[in-house]
Amino acid sequence: MAVISLLQGLSVGQQIGTAAAISVFVLTSIVVYGCYLHPLSHVPGPFLAKFSPIWGMRALYRMKFNSELQALHEKYGPVVRVAPNEVSFATLEAETAIYANQEDGRFSKAGTFLTLFSDLVLNAPTLITIPDPALHKRLHKVIQQAFTPQALASQEPIQKLHIEKAIPDFDETADKGYHIDLADKLETMFWEIIGDLAFGEPLMAGKRPTYEKLKQLGKGSMPMVEALSFMLVMPGVAPTLEMARSFLSAMPMSSQLSKLVPSTKLRDCVERKDGREDFLSAIMGSEKQGLTLDADAFFSNAMGLTLAGYQTTATTLASTFYHVLRYTDAYKTLCTEIRSAFNDEAEITGERLARLPFLNACIRETLRLLPPANGKTAQRTAPSCTIADTYIPAGTIVSADLYTIQRSPKYFVDPARFHPERWLEDAEKNGFNGDNRSASRPFLIGSRACIGRHMAQQSIRLIMATLLWRYDFELLDPDGFIWERDAGSSLIYTDYKLPVHVKRFQ
């Protein structure tokens, strides 16, 4: 109040000059503190990241987060400060330190980018974002029932059903000589699969366009969420933060989400009791662990698991086809393996596909090059500790960047190229004896590792094997779309495509 009274006694010119001087002083203080006095001032990184969220906002706005973070690590080393209160690591040792032992809650999900984004879109914490380790453990135990070997076996007929439903469209494309965006077809196919697996019936059938609108809204909000993450650790910004929260919450993301699965339809699924081991039934079993989920928590967990599982699996499915089609020798080897392993399409099963070495090598190599989770989705809030010989004060946001680690020459021979041979038994004879296979952990490790990874891999195997058994695919223009150059990356990959010619094989 005294400052305001003082300013009121000045002329307009003096008021402007004084306000400018105060602004310069405050800005200079922020810069000096961030660069020289902050507890993380010893960590190297870009100048703007030392005192502002601008580096992260810009990388997210450009949709080049993965490649730009990798470039930072190449410039500054394995430990990089990417925001005033955030550090990214690019070593296997750091990855193990952050994620391997999480049951004590020392490295928490609280305050991370993904948790904040989820809070803005959903009305309750989910298995993916819940910070309490004890609560997470109990919820994980019940939801795990949807991903047991028994559950996977029961899910296979549903996966095959939706694959078969897509076949007439591929047949027509092949017969008429059309070309298609294979990525779009694959995503639509898996959308129908996971909707059925999640809710016990095709509850989301035909609603992928609604999800795509939601995804575009989410993509546009990423820079603002990055700014909010920065503001969370600043003193005295609560009113501004709440205003920003209200603004983001007012965006139509939540309304689009409710269109995917209306609450009345969800209640019908809850009341249906047919013994199916779907995601919804698993969540309903939470009461067996003494957990009582209200309607918001129930809906949030169902949608969180479904959409996270859909996007990561659909991306890996498309990117595996992308790599196989670009590397023609790998394509020929894979087709030969699949077509010689079975006498009839009916013999194609998840159990037998899990034993095909080259198919699984192609999937593993794709996951190494393009892990579905990156630094933003894998953030943790650290305790006071030392990681990779670097002191980290309590409350710092930390992550290990899988994209950079899994493409590092420190761990892999010829790391930027697609070499499925590196995952075969005779890899050492083929020149990959310098690989450290344990450095590829695309599903993360520890208690927060991806719960649906086996379901995802089974779906990918079944779809790829069925399509390559029936059809031959060829890229329209092998250099027309380059994933690393043209796809967007933030929390997820976006804007990828796969234009192909399709021919019947038999």
UniProtKB/Swiss-Prot annotation:
Enzyme class of the recorded protein, top EC level: oxidoreductase
Pfam families with a match to the protein in the record: p450 (PF00067)
Pathway: Secondary metabolite biosynthesis; terpenoid biosynthesis
Annotated EC: 1.-.-.-
PANTHER family: CYTOCHROME P450, P450, PUTATIVE (EUROFUNG)-RELATED
Family membership: Belongs to the cytochrome P450 family.
UniProt name for this protein: Cytochrome P450 monooxygenase tpcB
Organism per entry: Cochliobolus heterostrophus (strain C5 / ATCC 48332 / race O) (Southern corn leaf blight fungus)
Organism taxonomic ancestry: Eukaryota, Fungi, Dikarya, Ascomycota, Pezizomycotina
